[in-house]
């Protein structure tokens, strides 16, 4: 094995601004398959750690793949430190997780990582389900999020359904959703961005609500009728990119929403069932 060892000079190691931990597909534009190119468009470096590796989303007539084994998953995380590739790390984002054990492994890694990176921004998209589909992850994941990842996160981006699951509160009107989000805030968890609050259906409006201890900001966007998948993953990629580029939270959320709308319309114009990223006007 020693004869195969070529690269041992850690001063030459690639560095990343972001580690993105979520699903990956061979075909399609969800999870890291859309987040990584979106982050790179913003001029940031990212390492992608897969939680599941799938042929495509389950919305096609064939579907292959599954969750990454725990041994592999923990090894992927450990290898980033063994390569000394995290010296400039600024943020870790999480999306779709394959198993509750992955969440625990990730939390242990993040806890250790924060000792060397006390200012690390941890943003969690607690992917659990939605109003139309219900829970579409394994049933032990919501509790794993509550127990392991929420205590480490500075910000989370649940939809209404996920907010209800995490808090046990009804969130179908704006005031109750805001109250539920506030109940999650802590010394560590500084903000909740609700990505699908109730808007005006007649006016084709959708709301994104930014909740902090001191303020509530309701951002309205046009609703685009579509079955496109991966829009939430794209939103989170744009949001973390905006924050790392120095945008204030409300501005970063607003810009992320506008970018998602732009990508959705561009994709529709090109008659694709998978998101297509147009060039980014402002890198």
From Swiss-Prot:
Any GO MF annotation of the entry: pyridoxal kinase activity
InterPro entries: PdxK (IPR023479), PM/HMP-P_kinase-1 (IPR013749), PyrdxlKinase (IPR004625), Ribokinase-like (IPR029056)
Signal peptide: none
Top-level taxon: Bacteria
Cofactors that this protein relies on: Mg(2+)
Enzyme Commission code: 2.7.1.35
Keyword Transferase: yes
EC top class, as a word: transferase
Catalyses which reaction(s): pyridoxal + ATP = pyridoxal 5'-phosphate + ADP + H(+); pyridoxine + ATP = pyridoxine 5'-phosphate + ADP + H(+); pyridoxamine + ATP = pyridoxamine 5'-phosphate + ADP + H(+)
Pathway terms, separated by semicolons: Cofactor metabolism; pyridoxal 5'-phosphate salvage; pyridoxal 5'-phosphate from pyridoxal: step 1/1; Cofactor metabolism; pyridoxal 5'-phosphate salvage; pyridoxine 5'-phosphate from pyridoxine: step 1/1; Cofactor metabolism; pyridoxal 5'-phosphate salvage; pyridoxamine 5'-phosphate from pyridoxamine: step 1/1
Gene Ontology annotations for the cellular component aspect, listed alphabetically: cytosol
Ligand binding (substrate): 23, 59, 233
Binding-site list for Mg(2+): 136, 162
HAMAP family: PdxK
Subunit structure: Homodimer.
Family, similarity comment: Belongs to the pyridoxine kinase family. PdxK subfamily.
NCBIfam families: PRK08176.1 (NF006034), pyridox_kin (TIGR00687)
Record PANTHER family: PYRIDOXAL KINASE, PYRIDOXINE_PYRIDOXAL_PYRIDOXAMINE KINASE
Function: B6-vitamer kinase involved in the salvage pathway of pyridoxal 5'-phosphate (PLP). Catalyzes the phosphorylation of pyridoxine (PN), pyridoxal (PL), and pyridoxamine (PM), forming their respective 5'-phosphorylated esters, i.e. PNP, PLP and PMP.
Protein name (record): Pyridoxine/pyridoxal/pyridoxamine kinase
Organism: Escherichia coli O157:H7
Underlying gene: pdxK
